[in-house]
Amino acid sequence: MVTTLDNALLEEILQQVRPLIGQGKVADYIPALAEVASDRLAIAVCTVDGEIFQAGNATERFSIQSISKVLSLTLALTRYQEHEIWQRVGKEPSGLPFNSLLQLEMEQGKPRNPFINPGALVVCDMLQTRLSAPKQRMLEVVRQLAGEEDLAYDSRVARSEFEHSDRNAAIAYLMKSFGNFENDVLTVLQTYFHYCALRMSCLELARSFVYLANHGRDLSGREVISPLQARQINALMMTSGMYDGAGEFAYRVGMPGKSGVGGGIVAIVPDELSIAVWSPELDASGNSLAGTAALELLSQRISRSIF
């Protein structure tokens, strides 16, 4: 039986997944993220008509981390011809950890997709080439999408990531050695870590990502990207948005999704909904444990899946 989507349903779902808290692990390789309270739990849903449903800590902001990779790709699609992007980054799932160097070496410095670290670094490198102030431009984009003028980067998280960035620097220099990186590595890393350190709430994320449910149009009706590009990003999220847990997520949830190690996940029901969940404890793939379970329950209760 299909259940009506409302706040009470979302509250009920959070109640059901709350016992999972304590079974995952908060990301601790970024010291500033390790301090986040592990008991946080939130969900927000925004319809293409702008109707909002929420439960839990849905207005509390957190570090969106790799969810920002969708936003940087979106921004790149407005600045480059598509073939220019896909010459430098692929569209295939990686099947390896998101910060792997092994595959990159084997494949001549061309990352598998834009949602793993090497691919996102290439996208940031491309933005660095075309934008005079890429950090400021991203803030303008997300503030417009979310309808919130005070959205900002957490400079402490960005600094913490930059101070522990040896592996990402190695990835960038490896790509540079293959001729797939144009700008100064440290400058691009600063931009990349600021994007990851964007602080947003589930409510703001759900509103911001409506354009992927609404053929590329945001809540105001403005075209962010074309309908075809929105469909293509959803396809990439489906195959590559959940690190090396994309198959598990497709099986359990059945929606395009993008996660971040801050514990957030954004999921899309094309033509209908944008959903954001947050629970900081992660599973072995780096995806929110309780967040994934909440999306699985929601998918079942409202009978929504792309399959």
Curated annotation (Swiss-Prot):
It holds the Pfam family Glutaminase. It catalyses: L-glutamine + H2O = L-glutamate + NH4(+). It comes from the Bacteria. Substrate binds at S66, N117, E161, N168, Y192, Y243, V261. One of its GO terms (molecular function) is glutaminase activity. Keywords: Hydrolase. It is an enzyme of class 3 (hydrolase). InterPro entries: Beta-lactam/transpept-like, Glutaminase. GO terms for biological process: glutamate biosynthetic process; glutamine catabolic process. Its EC number is 3.5.1.2. HAMAP family: Glutaminase. Belongs to the glutaminase family. Homotetramer. This is Glutaminase.
